[in-house]
Structures are given as structure tokens and as C-alpha cells.
Amino acid sequence: MTMEQGVKAGFAQGLALLLPPTSAVMGILLLVPVAPQMMQAFSDVPGVDFLVPILLTLPGLCIALFSPVAGLLGDRLGRRRLLIGAMLVYGLAGMAPMLLSDIYQILASRVVVGVCEALIMTLCTTLVGDLFSGRARERWLASQTAVASVSALLFLALGGLLGRQGWQGPFLIYGLIWPMALAVLLLVREPPRVERQVPGWSALPGRHVALTSVTTILAATLFYTIQINVSTVLPDFGITDPARIGLFSAVASIGTPVGSLIFWTVARRDVRLLLGMEFALMAVAFIAMAHAPDAAWFIAGAFVGQAAAGLLLPTLLTWAMSTLAFEVRGRGMGLWQSAFAIGQFMSALVVPALAVATGSTVDAFPIIAAGSLLVGLMSLLLLFRSRWSPA
């Protein structure tokens, strides 16, 4: 299949593809406020302390495992119909626990949710690459990061509000995916293509995909390290009230959409320069958090780190997409989504291990900062080396 260059799409199409990827945020954060209630409701089930956290994280694991398959299906079968079908099934599987009373059946429904999330995330991003180019593509990809961050705050609040009606309440929100599916159906068209045999995996630019995937794993690990650990470190500064912890965490999270908006103004810069500066800024944030004298300074450091992430993620996404031909773009984006999900999983392993070795989570931050700074310096070195090399 080949696509004509310069496919025209406007604001309506961009918006229709901007909202569905919030499903990945929805999949995790909606249930965070009701996790204690679920543990109580299934307290007679052996291993419930293990099973309930698995309910929250299982969709993320499915994204890591199935995103490359989702990309392959998108390349072979087309993007739009597969996306709409995944969104419809996502709504059904997401709301299913409202009618289920067996935790293992709920676990099964969460697997379906995760597979659908892999399809939705991969195909929406791929379609943005298909339908937009140049600055428009960069801005819509940056907007995905910003909207996902803002939606995280919304879904946490909605989860807590509906959780007052019982642990099943938040599952109702999964039905919001259906109006989004209708918008995709009405507004988005499959990109024009000429049918021919779809090339194999070898058609992917292997070196480029490997480099962007490894860098994305590192970036996602840093991003989620801040997101996950802000609320766990704040009690060390005497902030123990859940409402205040939520407020402080929300302030830090605002940094991500701010960074994504800044990306709009710098997106045309050399990617090596951007990555160098962004990883260096992330290192500054971790140093600031490690040496913060009080909660306000700690949150200021976290805000800087989230802003760096808001710059870093769309940089990586546009870089990953830059060399992908239409015929393999789905698989390339699937591998990128998989790498991002692996980074999320890695953050839950790396930080506790470093905390054990250093004595606390905060004491581990300088080591993380050093790693981030090293990646940034390597990126800048590659930039300067290319500029100093003789033509």
C-alpha cells in the first residue's frame, strides 16, 4: 500500500483522533480511588492484595505486549475500521465489571481492555501521521501528550466521585469511548492507498526504530518515576492529608501540558539538540527534588521534570515517525507504544531497587539525574560531532 503525500485533514479530524488515546489514562487512573474498596469487596479471595493492583496495571502490560501486533494489523487491514471496532469493544469490556462479581472474570475483562487500548493508541497515532504532515503533525502529536496529562486529573476526580456509589461506579466512565467512536466514524476517513502486498517487518528502518525505542524506554522511565513518586515522597515533608497530596500532585502534573505547548515553538529544531536539552532539564529536575528543603521546592522540581517530559515525549514521537513510510507506519508506531509502556513498567522496578541501595527514594534521585544527564550529553555530542565532521 502507498499513500499519497499531503493528505488534507483539518481541526475536526485532529480532534477526533486526539481524544481516544486518553483511554490508556482512563484504564489505570479511574480505578485508583476505588482500589481500597475493591480489596474490601473481594477480601475473601486469596491473594486479593496482589490481584487488585494487577487489575490496575494489566492494561498497561497488554499495551507493551500487543502494540506491535496492533500496528501490523493496521498496516494489513487498514486503520479506521479497526480503530472503530476496538473502541466499541473497549466500551463493552470496560463497563463489564459493573455486572461482574468474580474477580477473575474482571481480570479477563481487563485483558480485553488492554488489547483494545493497544489498538486505539497505536492506530490513532498512526492516523495522525497519515493525515497530517509538517507542523500540523508535530502539533497534533504534542497535543496528545497535553490532553493525556489533563485527562489524568479529570479521571482521578471522576473516579473518586463515582467511587462514592461503590467500587463499580468508575467503570461507567468507559462508556465515554462510544461518542468518541462515533466522531471517528463521521469525521475520519481511511487514507487513500493503492493496494499491493504489504512489506514484511524487514521493511522497517531497523536501526532508527531500535534507537528511538531504547530512548523512549529511558524517557518513559523518567516520566513515570516522577508521576508515581510525587505522592509517596510528599509525606516525608509532612504532607499527609490526601486532599493536599492530590493538590500538590496536580500542580506538578500541569507541567506536562505546559511542556507540550512549548514544544509547538521548538519542534523544528534538530532532534539531537532537543533531546540533549530535554534530558538535561530532566536531570536538573531530579537534582532539585533530591535537595528540596520543603514540599514547595520539591513540587517546583517535579513541575520542571513534568515540563521536560511534556517536551520530551512529542520529540520522541515525531522523531520515531519521521522515517516511517506509510506501509510500515502502523508497526513502527506499535513498537514505539510498546517501548513507552515498557518504560512505565521499568519505573516500577528501577526506582524501588535504587531506593533500597541508597536508603530512600529521594536519595536515588541523584543517580537517576546522572543517567538522564548522560543521555542528554550523548545526544548533544552526536549533534556537535555531525557539525564538526568535514562535508
PLM segments and residue spans:
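Extracytoplasmic
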Residues: A12-S43, I226-S231
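Conserved MFS/SLC helix-loop-helix module at the cytosolic interface between two early adjacent transmembrane helices
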Residues: A64-D102
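Extracellular/periplasmic helix-loop-helix junction of adjacent transmembrane segments
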Residues: V34-A64
